[in-house]
């Protein structure tokens, strides 16, 4: 039936999803025709969602095995590796971050596309519901006018025209025309029940879509936050941040696989509908609407006759006949019975109102309006909606794989940071080769003896207040330094390089420099230095 449509063609991805294997819980093949009320068909969709659950279980199992092996092999690696190689962890973190960012971009696009498709669906349903409401309103108003208003006027006129048999005969003929109109309007399908069903479907769909969109939005934001926290944790080498990332990453991994299963099942079910939507609608309306009416609105072809054309024609002819009769009574009967003018004018206004309702009803019953809403709903669901679901499934798959890799890299990074901290804690403070010890020896803030040296020669005259480096040096080292400077008087007063020992003696220039110090400088450097 779907192949005969000239104005709607299901996209190729719906056929691809429609051909997915449909298996029940007994691993038996199920018909892929869209039948959401059928238990076997429901099991086939749940089975597709369970595939993601199985993948999640395998992923968690592999992570458990990896973490166990990592913990068991930790001691051996610590003994063999003096300086752990962080290249693999760094590249894994970089690639994982890029994949997560790409997945989030795909997810935002898919979430927006799905939301646009569902919005177009609900908008079309509300428009169709408004059209059906207008049809019901026009039919109801016309029935009320014929059954109540016209009947009252005819009863009063029958009393007034009782002396004249020809006039009463005209009134009976008008009553027959009104009965014909009532019969045709009553034969029209009841649209109130359909209207209520469409309104409920649209409201429920909009409610579900809002929370679906919000859930995916929060999941996308959570993925970005975890990615940023991972970068921050690796940059600051913070173990507690890595622990938080492990917990949040595990939760996000579970949610990613769950969203993949739900998205796959929804996309396959929607594609089953999109491949043959007419067949499903015909089956659903069976017993409520005739097949002629359903086909008329589903296809809206010029070759299909309007099923309401005969009723509308009888309605129009009956109104025209009644208007002619009323016009004749106004022309001839009012002269004899002046009191009948009021009721005749009332009937004329009622017939004019019914004719206006007839024109509106004819326009509303035309297939083009409802068929347009039907096509827009199909395009919204089967094009934007299913396409967005595919992008969301791709996002979930990429995010699940990326977080699986992240959960493998984070424990390794945590161990490398722990090894680094342990190595720093194991440094011997008394070790003469300790870089920290050598730094403290040359750190002016930790010196106890302050030295002041005056440099003069071709370099210029400069008074310098330099605290000495506290360290002891042997005589050979000092002599080696003297040989280094080749007994140049220019470097006579330079403190020994590489040693914390002061010069063996102080020159008069140094004493002069010290005596020229201000009180503030003396308070700053203390009284440790004595000349």
UniProtKB/Swiss-Prot annotation:
Residue intervals on the Cytoplasmic side: 66-87, 235-239, 411-531
InterPro entries associated with the record: Tweety
GO molecular function: intracellularly calcium-gated chloride channel activity; volume-sensitive chloride channel activity
Carbohydrate attachment residues: 129, 283, 352
Compartments, as annotated in UniProt: Cell membrane
Topological category with respect to the lipid bilayer: Multi-pass membrane protein
Segments in the Extracellular topological domain: 1-44, 109-213, 261-389
Pfam family, one: Tweety
Signal peptide: none
Transmembrane stretches, start-end: 45-65, 88-108, 214-234, 240-260, 390-410
Family note: Belongs to the tweety family.
Annotated protein name in UniProt: Protein tweety homolog 2-like
Organism in which the protein naturally occurs: Danio rerio
Gene that encodes it: ttyh2l
């Amino acid at each position: 039936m779907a192949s005969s449509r000239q104005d709607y063609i299901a996209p190729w991805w719906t056929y691809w999803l429609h051909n997915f294997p449909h298996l029940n819980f007994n691993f038996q093949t199920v018909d892929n025709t869209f039948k959401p009320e059928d238990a076997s068909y429901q099991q086939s969709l749940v089975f597709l969602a369970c595939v993601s659950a199985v993948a999640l279980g395998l992923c968690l199992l592999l992570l458990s095995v990896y973490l166990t092996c990592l913990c068991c092999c930790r001691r051996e690696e610590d003994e063999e590796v003096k300086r752990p190689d962080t290249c693999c962890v760094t590249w894994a973190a970089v690639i994982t971050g890029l994949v997560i960012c790409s997945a989030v971009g795909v997810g935002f696009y898919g979430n927006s596309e799905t939301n646009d498709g569902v919005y177009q669906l609900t908008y079309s349903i509300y428009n169709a519901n408004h059209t059906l409401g207008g049809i019901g309103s026009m039919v109801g108003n016309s029935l009320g006018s014929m059954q109540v208003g016209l009947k009252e006027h005819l009863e009063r006129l029958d009393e007034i025209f009782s002396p004249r048999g020809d006039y009463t005969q005209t009134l009976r003929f008008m009553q027959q025309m009104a009965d014909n109109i009532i019969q045709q309007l009553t034969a029209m399908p009841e649209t109130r029940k359909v209207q209520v069903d469409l309104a409920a479907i649209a409201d429920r769909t909009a409610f579900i879509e809002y929370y679906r969109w919000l859930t995916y939005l929060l999941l996308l934001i959570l993925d970005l936050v975890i990615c940023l926290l991972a970068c921050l944790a690796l940059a600051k080498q913070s173990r507690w941040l890595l622990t938080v990332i492990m917990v949040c990453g595990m939760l996000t991994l579970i949610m990613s696989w769950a969203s993949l299963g739900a998205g796959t099942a929804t996309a396959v079910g929607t594609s089953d509908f999109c491949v043959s939507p007419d067949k499903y609608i015909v089956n659903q309306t069976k017993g409520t609407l005739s097949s002629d009416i359903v086909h008329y609105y589903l296809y809206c072809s010029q070759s299909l006759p309007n099923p309401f054309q005969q009723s509308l024609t009888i309605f129009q002819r009956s109104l025209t006949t009644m208007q002619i009769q009323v016009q004749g009574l106004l022309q001839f009967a009012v002269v004899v019975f002046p009191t009948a003018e009021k009721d005749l004018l009332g009937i004329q206004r009622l017939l004019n109102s019914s004719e206006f309702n007839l024109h509106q009803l004819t326009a509303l019953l035309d297939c083009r309006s409802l068929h347009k809403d039907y096509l827009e709903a199909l395009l919204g669901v089967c094009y934007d909606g299913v396409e967005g679901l595919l992008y969301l499934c791709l996002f979930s798959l990429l995010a699940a794989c990326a977080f699986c890799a992240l959960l493998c890299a984070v424990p390794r990074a945590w161990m490398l940071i722990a090894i680094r901290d342990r190595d720093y804690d194991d440094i011997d403070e008394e070790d003469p080769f300790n870089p920290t010890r050598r730094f403290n020896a040359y750190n002016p803030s930790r010196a106890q003896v302050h030295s002041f040296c005056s440099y003069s020669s071709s370099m210029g005259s400069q008074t310098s207040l330099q605290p000495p480096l506290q360290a002891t040096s042997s005589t050979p080292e000092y002599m080696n330094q003297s040989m280094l400077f080749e007994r140049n008087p220019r470097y006579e007063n330079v403190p020994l390089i590489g040693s914390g020992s002061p010069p063996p003696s102080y020159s008069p220039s140094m004493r002069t420099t010290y005596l020229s110090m201000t009180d503030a400088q003396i308070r700053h450097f203390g009284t440790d230095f004595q000349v």
